[in-house]
Amino acid sequence: MRIAVMGAGAWGTALALSLCASTASSHQVTLWTRSRQHLADLVSQRINRRYFSAFPLPASLRLTAGLEEAVEDAELALIVVPVSGLRETLREIAASGKKIPVIWGCKGFESQSAKLPHQVAEEEYAGAAPYGVLSGPSFALEIAQGLPAALTLASRDGEFAREVAAQLHAPRLRVYSCTDVVGVETGGAVKNVISIAAGICDGMGFGSNARAALITRGLAEITRLGLKLGGRMETFLGLTGVGDLILTCTGDLSRNRRVGLALAAGRSLPDILQELGHIAEGVHTAREVLRLSHLLGIEMPITKGVCSILDDGVPAGQAVEALLNREPKSEIY
């Protein structure tokens, strides 16, 4: 299959490396970057120095900074840009006149609009071609290393989801299919917020019991919001729900967890993000999720606590105390 990977960040580069290395399918892969300077570095070095300096880009991987060139003969576009760049990328693909199926790998809600990626696609790409989302517990570095992983490809077009999942499936990358786009996207977005909270919990030395409780109650928040938005319960118990949540709340490669650890140490958010050097989607997503929870009348105390730290300057310890001192209630409600 001819695949255009749109975005040469960590996740886009990892997917491109994985697709090129696949022995199960013979893919022709193009990696697109918006930056011509980045392209020049990739071409001259044949490595992505910023993210994966230890992994040479294979000779078969085509590189370009021209969007029309990237999608010209592609049979599938994998859009791997932050949520903030999804709308523009979809709009540019549509403007190219190439009506090719698209899959995105970003996780979060669009800032200001609080829209999930599929809602952005409905506005910018509806009717052009089938589309869907690729999500699940996956650190880009481990995908680049060829370590085993399992993901879910969701599309409202079930046949399309099954066909693309089969194409992306590889010996060490198992890809499942489903039709619950809302559930998959909600799990992938909100888990980043819970991951910040988990980092705060670990950074303050609260131990394994507290972390387990936080992850479990975080899953409850994800499920409440997801069901209200139209997702299915079983999705939140799968790879893109509890699976992704566990990984990002416990793995040392999680950017959002690292933000939480630094907040617990008393560091300022601007300094944390500057040192991180990469986007931590949970920071932006937290605000949109909290706004949605108010609009929909959903109780999300962990999300509220994270936002109080990020936006209101509440010390991490004080926010945790506020959570612990909430009125007792039934676990299931």
Swiss-Prot record:
Q: Write out the catalytic residues in the record.
A: 191
UniProt EC number: 1.1.1.94
Q: Residues of the signal sequence?
A: none
Record GO terms (molecular function): glycerol-3-phosphate dehydrogenase [NAD(P)+] activity; NAD binding
Q: Where in the cell is it found?
A: Cytoplasm
Lineage, top-rank taxon, reads: Bacteria
A single GO BP term for this record reads:
phospholipid biosynthetic process
Q: What Gene Ontology cellular component terms go with this record? A: cytosol
Q: Which residues bind NADPH?
A: 11, 34, 107, 140, 255, 279, 281
Q: Which UniProt keywords apply?
A: Cytoplasm, Lipid biosynthesis, Lipid metabolism, NAD, NADP, Nucleotide-binding, Oxidoreductase, Phospholipid biosynthesis, Phospholipid metabolism
Q: What is its main location?
A: cytoplasm
Write down the InterPro entries for this protein, in alphabetical order: 6-PGluconate_DH-like_C_sf, 6PGD_dom2, G3P_DH_NAD-dep, G3P_DH_NAD-dep_C, G3P_DH_NAD-dep_N, NAD(P)-bd_dom_sf
Q: In which pathway does it act?
A: Membrane lipid metabolism; glycerophospholipid metabolism
Question: What general EC class does the enzyme of this chain belong to?
Answer: oxidoreductase
Binding residues for sn-glycerol 3-phosphate, per the UniProt record?
Answer: 107, 136, 138, 191, 244, 254-256
> Which reaction equations make up its catalytic activity?
sn-glycerol 3-phosphate + NAD(+) = dihydroxyacetone phosphate + NADH + H(+); sn-glycerol 3-phosphate + NADP(+) = dihydroxyacetone phosphate + NADPH + H(+)
Its function, per the record, reads: Catalyzes the reduction of the glycolytic intermediate dihydroxyacetone phosphate (DHAP) to sn-glycerol 3-phosphate (G3P), the key precursor for phospholipid synthesis.
Entry-linked HAMAP family: NAD_Glyc3P_dehydrog
As for family, the record states: Belongs to the NAD-dependent glycerol-3-phosphate dehydrogenase family.
Q: What is this protein called?
A: Glycerol-3-phosphate dehydrogenase [NAD(P)+]
